[in-house]
Amino acid sequence: MIPEIIRNTIFIGCGSFIGGAARYLISVAMKAMSKGFPWGTLVVNLVGCLVIGLLWGFFSKNSSESSSWALFMTVGICGGFTTFSTFSKEALIMLQAGNFMSLLAYVAISVIAGIALVAAGYYLVRI
């Protein structure tokens, strides 16, 4: 029998692979339309916020579901899909370039819409 911590680590790693690969593919696909604004990162982070809200609502409502499955989906896939470090790097690049309006819009949309989408996802499932 595999210890739970090893099993969960494997589940998270597999989910991270899926989420990271999906993030890369979306970023590549959106690069052509970016024109200097990090649309790919914004889209994956906002989609990830909605998805983690939906999953949080689902797993809190259905506590009988496996914690390994919840870790695979939330920490693994959503964690691999979304990226705070790239968001921060892109924000710093805008700051260094003096693109203050783009920086303000990027940070405000990311944070405000991100929180709103997590809440929307959570409450949609909890209804």
Residue ranges and their predicted role:
Residues 1-127:
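Membrane-interface helix-loop junctions in multi-pass transporters/channels
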